[in-house]
């Protein structure tokens, strides 16, 4: 079997052209991270004879806290990478990239966290071998196809929505930079009071919206009352 080569990229200017359609592992998101204050992206690429067969993207996030340690860095990874050659075991490729990434960032990060794993057992052996441990989180699954939105809502929620509409509350897409900025500032103030919650830098949302303007894969919706933004998503 031909040897697999692992490369680490930290600079978007030298990123090669890579296959794939996954946003968490895309070159576009890599460059967005680069432009966001406090964010440093890392891309691990596995290749054979210069042909990419897998990639795994991570981001190192710098956090400033009120209590010691006042400055910490944590590495976050969404998913388990993207794979392009079915002749190789995804779990084995993941294990190689996981070990490489762990050795690369552990010396500078307080914590390495994987989120949005496809299954609870994927890569379990490799996680254990590299010193990772599972954390239980509440997962909520909503089917978007079995029932219409109106039928999925509880009667109490329907009454709340109808009452809000009656008093003039409106929902619309935030198309102007001013509306998006106002809403993001509102969210940031809400998250700032929650010690265990993190709100990403505002630039990250703005860059995501700009980069996906044509595809509309990242959109902001706002709720207004008397021409004042009171919520959104």
Question: What do the PLM-derived regions correspond to, one by one?
Answer:
Residues 63-134:
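Acyl-donor binding region in acyl/amide transferases
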Residues 2-65, 116-233:
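A conserved beta-strand-loop-helix scaffold within acyl/acetyltransferase catalytic domains
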